[in-house]
C-alpha cells in the first residue's frame, strides 16, 4: 500500500509509525531535526565516533537494529561509518537531490527516520560507506 505526499509522489509506508506530535515527544529537538526533518549533525560531534565496544547500533527513533560494530570503520569523515547494515531489511535508501547534488539517503527500514547517506567509497568487502548521523543511532553494548 502506498500513500501520496503533498508533492503527489508515492510515500513509503513503514511498519512503525507515529504522529508528528508523538515524534516530537519521543525525540530530542536535535534528533527530530535530523531524523524527521532530514537534517545533518555537525561532523565530529557524536560520541559514537570514538565508540570501540562491541554491540549494536539501533535506530534512536524506534529501536530497530541497524548496524554492528563488526561493520564499523574509521572513515575520517567525522561521522560514524559502516560498510554494511545488519541485514537487507534494516535500512532503506532513496535518491536525495538536495543541496544541488545527487546522493543516496539512508533511512530506518522500520520507521523511515533519516539516518544519513551511503557512498560508494567504503572498504572491502562492500566498497560502501554508510555515513550515519550519530544522533540517529542508539548504541547498545553487547
What spans do the regions from the language model cover?
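Short, contiguous pre-domain boundary segments
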Residues: 1-20
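A short Gly-Trp-Pro
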Residues: 14-142
